[in-house]
A protein has these predicted regions:
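Short, small-residue-biased leader/transition segments that mark boundaries at the very start
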Residues: 1-5, 473-480
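Helix-loop-helix hairpins and the membrane-proximal interhelical loops
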Residues: 16-74, 245, 249-344
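Helix-loop-helix junctions within the multi-pass membrane cores of secondary transporters/permeases
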Residues: 22-53, 57, 81-82, 102-111, ...
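Structural signature of hydrophobic alpha-helical transmembrane segments
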Residues: 68-80, 123-132, 208-220, 404-414, ...
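Hydrophobic mid-bilayer segments of alpha-helices in multi-pass membrane transport proteins
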Residues: 103-105, 130-135, 172, 219-227, ...
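Flexible hinge motifs at transmembrane-helix junctions and intramembrane kinks/re-entrant loops
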Residues: 213-214, 227-282, 314-318, 446-459, ...
Length: 480
């Protein structure tokens, strides 16, 4: 009888190991000391933090907002661009990073279509520029440019990364963390505009702001969510970020921050009739494949502008992705001994390919989202996190009003918490050496106040090399 029990126990252990090995066969979940449950929670956290892009992206690209007949098409293109890009991250790069049309870049595309560049570019023209920028980014990621110290071939893009000073690379995660937190504070109306000082803390003493749905109510929703996340994280509760977002969403209902009209289909451009959105998208008249059909018929005399815009799109996408990947991967400890993210080349190929796919579908540059840090902070370490995000974006196309119902103030609590977690990387910066501390500080502060990861990196590198050349020149002995 004892032998029978032993065989049953051993058999159970064997089956358990077999089952675990199957679940790990592709994503290597146990290798990174994670679990399927953790990865699912992480994917949900990332999605909830970035779901706002579904409505914000069409509004940024189309100046007419929901009144523009192309709004539904751009919404579908936004979701599909996010799905394709994030699936590439899941299956090619196998990293817990999510992609979607990037903020800032979509506003640039909107200004191009709106005529702000001095030429009247069509929607197809703008998508063609984005498409070519994606091709340039892809070429930079695959063209070989020498070998590293291990004899492995490296790409031109990797050479650019290797040429980045260490002080700047160490500053990127800190800057991105503060940048994410700053976005969260703004989305929550905790930080508001001021015509004299540009920014200020929301005035909690102003009774007008306490009206139902007012700025103080939004701030309270985010602060409440942050407190919930912090307390649950202190006790190592899995899914603390998601619970915090959902709890603050519930609080937002009586405070009037959440718009209940969204759920009943009373908001223009947001409907439960998903087939109407798909019909508009697949008609082909609004966005899809316009980059090919009408994209390369540029206005006369706009060649130089087109070249500059294309290079700008490619460089912003590349440096934004580099910065986001370094920040998120360093926070998740998914970096090699040289401080580079694991599967770095595949991450870049995934990003550039997603940009090309997005342009063909009719949306602006698809890039790796800093909100991926929300999933990383929830424990996401593998491509399964990205897969969950992609699935949720797929579902969102059919349940758009439900996801649009989550107020930005509720998601802001997660962004602020991510900023707290990424701030710990500041201890890696050598502040004893001014040659490192000054460029590091400029990188961080310019990234936040300049509202651009790329500008922060660029300013930091510029200051570093100016100081480097100046100090070398000053330290040279005078020859007689």
């Amino acid at each position: 009888l004892g032998d029978v029990y032993k065989r049953q126990i051993l058999g159970g252990v064997f089956l358990k190991k077999t089952k675990r090995s199957k679940s790990d066969s592709f994503f290597n979940i146990s290798k990174y000391k994670s679990s399927v449950k953790t990865e699912i929670f992480a994917g949900l956290a990332t999605f909830l933090a970035m779901a706002y892009i579904l409505t914000v992206n069409p509004n940024n690209i189309l100046w007419g907002g929901t009144s523009d007949p192309r709004f539904a098409s751009v919404f579908i293109a936004t979701a599909l661009g996010a799905i394709i890009g994030t699936l590439l991250m899941a299956f090619l790069a196998k990293m817990p990073l999510a992609q979607a049309p990037g903020m800032g870049l979509n506003a640039m595309v909107g200004s191009i279509i709106g005529g702000a560049m001095g030429f009247t570019f069509s929607y197809g023209n703008a998508m063609a520029l984005v498409l070519v920028s994606g091709i340039i980014f892809l070429l930079l990621s695959i063209i070989p440019c020498g070998k590293d110290k291990y004899g492995k071939k490296v790409s031109l893009r990797e050479k650019i990364f290797d040429g980045m000073p260490k002080a700047i690379r160490l500053s990127i995660p800190v800057g991105i963390g503060l940048f994410i937190a700053f976005i969260g504070l703004q989305n929550a109306s905790i930080i508001v505009d001021n015509k004299f000082t540009l920014l200020q803390l929301v005035d909690f003493n102003n009774p007008e702001f306490w009206a139902k749905g007012g700025t103080c109510c939004s701030a309270i929703v985010a602060i409440f969510g942050l407190i919930v996340i912090t307390i649950l994280s202190h006790y190592n509760v899995k899914g603390s970020v998601i619970i915090g977002i959902l709890a603050s969403t519930v609080l937002s209902i009586p405070l009037g921050v959440a718009n209940l009209d969204i759920l009943v289909g009373k908001v223009d451009g947001i409907s439960w009739k998903f087939w109407e959105n798909f019909q508009a998208f697949f008609s082909g008249d609004n966005t899809v494949f316009l980059s090919f059909v009408k994209g390369f018929d540029f206005p006369e005399g706009s060649l130089l502008t087109c070249i500059m815009l294309t290079i700008t799109f490619a460089m912003i996408d590349m440096f934004d992705t580099m910065g986001t990947c370094v920040g998120c991967c360093q926070n998740a400890k998914l970096i090699d001994e040289d401080g580079k993210p694991l599967n770095y080349d595949k991450i870049m190929i995934s990003d550039s390919t997603a940009t090309m796919a997005g342009a063909m579908l009719g949306t602006s540059t698809v890039t790796t989202f800093v909100e991926s840090g929300a999933g990383v902070s929830a424990g996401g370490k593998t491509g399964l996190t990205a897969l969950v995000v992609a699935i949720l974006f797929l579902v969102s196309m059919f349940l758009f009003p439900l996801f649009a119902f989550i107020p930005s103030a509720a998601a802001a609590s997660a962004l602020i918490y991510v900023g707290v977690l990424m701030m710990k990387n500041v201890v890696n910066i050598d502040f004893e050496n001014v040659k490192n501390s000054v460029p590091s500080f400029i990188t961080i502060i310019a990234m936040v106040l300049g509202y651009s990861i790329t500008d922060g990196i660029g300013m930091g590198i510029l200051i570093f090399f100016i100081l480097d050349l100046s100090l070398i020149h000053i330290s040279e002995p005078t020859r007689h």
